[in-house]
Amino acid sequence: LRLVGSEMCIRDRNHNEPEMPSSVFVALVGRPNVGKSSLTNHLVGEKVAIVTQKAQTTRNRITGIITKGPVQYVLLDTPGIHKPRNRLDSRMTQTAAASLKDVDVTLMLFEPTGEFTESELGMVEALRKAGPAIAVINKVDLLNDFAALEARKKQVEEFGIFDAIVTVSAKDGTGCEELFPLLKQYANPGPHYFDDDAFTDMPEKELVAELVREKALLFMREEIPHGIAVTVESFKERPDSDLIDISVEICCERKSHKGMIIGKGGQMLKKIASAARMDCEELLGARVNLQCWVKVREDWRDNDRLLDNLGFAKP
């Protein structure tokens, strides 16, 4: 106790000294649809990860960057941990696991109620060996039962691996700001890795592709969206205007799916393209001419060559 008091006195006496720059790398892991991307977007203050109600929306590791004074927080939003059903799923699961090796601390998100999945329990065991971790119980806005929330906190505490347990709502922001002082404790001194005004390291083309895929996920029937991949084939800024011409390929697994994506009279494809174009214009700060094309690549989720070509690199 005396030592803690002495440390506090020293800190107080030197409070006017400027803090040195530091950075902390943070992985966000958890089951599909637990709110990792929503939390990333809320903390960053920008849309860097697409969000839908469908599980497994995030496929690649997404980087969000926040700089608060001398501290830069680098968030790695990972695919949801689940039992793989194809080679794409396997790569997604490997990406989530590999992220634990690249960070200073891990945020593991949990639902406020319900049983823990086998994949969640496996991730908890992986965290025992990986390093510091903080538990984040999300979606508390959906829970009015204080006793149930306390019971959930106790369940998570019993894992015995988390330095802290935080309750948040990524939807309305409740408790989210409390994460920054906790994460700051794991920061390492040194120059920032990214510009202080950066919010992601994702290329513009990749962001555009994700926005198109988000609209397909939102508008398409359940059986189709997870068989879709999106790539930007061309991205050209016109030198004489503020217009950007973008050509996008939407890849699907079945000819029947191609017809559904295009829709009667092309209406579904127009709906997807129109909604994506508006988001692209907001992202790029310019007018966008977005052309979307649909191509069939049968069983691409189980084809390593196609996965490589579509940008799903092995971690």
Name each model-derived stretch.
Residues 37-38:
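Walker A/P-loop
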Residues 204-315:
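P-loop NTP-binding site
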Residues 32, 55, 172:
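The conserved Walker
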Residues 132, 141-200:
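Canonical P-loop GTPase G-domain recognition
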